[in-house]
Amino acid sequence: MYTPPLARLIEQLQRLPGVGPKTAQRLALHILKRPENEIQALASALIEAKKKVGLCNVCFHFSADPICEICRNPNRDKQTICVVADSRDVIALEKTREYKGRYHVLGGVMSPMDGIGPEQLYIQPLVRRVTQDGVKEVILAISPTVEGETTTLYIGQLLKPFTKVTRIAFGLPMGGDLEYADEVTLARALEGRRELD
């Protein structure tokens, strides 16, 4: 049905999150119709991003520098850390323009079924930041899935002896993801955060 190069392109596109067979086919056919210089620019951008974008040494958000812009910004509140599962959550919260503190990206959530425990996440660096940097509040902004709740409770118990721990209020249904929430919902969730019991 497809020539081998087209079949390989479709197969690789299907590896992207949210891209099924039909979308992969549509994208592949679109790519083939574009001028070669546009395809070269796309390929170059992919390779450059992979080579130059890593993780911030402080918060583990994506960064082209050893320390990201948010962590370097002297106007950000150093005494407040918002803990999120993924860099997409940082981007979603930043769009609200409500939060003025710093972040900590865990790199996922605890999921015993998938073999992801506390050791596979950036939890120990968070504990070090809290205990060494005089952090006054940790805001847990993790999606309210079963795994997210497990992670929230674990981190809350771990950090309570050292600082105030709150979690954002959710105007989201259980099982929802932060990245799909609108800015108003996220802003209200930040405003309505509460201390963990």
Curated annotation (Swiss-Prot):
Keyword DNA damage: yes
GO terms assigned for molecular function: DNA binding; zinc ion binding
Keywords attached to this entry: DNA damage, DNA recombination, DNA repair, Metal-binding, Zinc, Zinc-finger
Gene3D superfamilies xref list: 3.40.1360.10, 6.10.250.240, RecR Domain 1 (1.10.8.420)
InterPro entries: DNA_Rcmb_RecR, Hlx-hairpin-Hlx_DNA-bd_motif, Rcmb_RecR, Rcmb_RecR_Znf, TOPRIM_dom, TOPRIM_RecR
Zinc finger (C4-type): 56-71
Entry's Gene Ontology BP terms: DNA recombination; DNA repair
Toprim domain location: 79-173
Function, as annotated: May play a role in DNA repair. It seems to be involved in an RecBC-independent recombinational process of DNA repair. It may act with RecF and RecO.
Entry's family note: Belongs to the RecR family.
Protein name: Recombination protein RecR
Source organism (scientific name): Rippkaea orientalis (strain PCC 8801 / RF-1) (Cyanothece sp. (strain PCC 8801))
Gene: recR
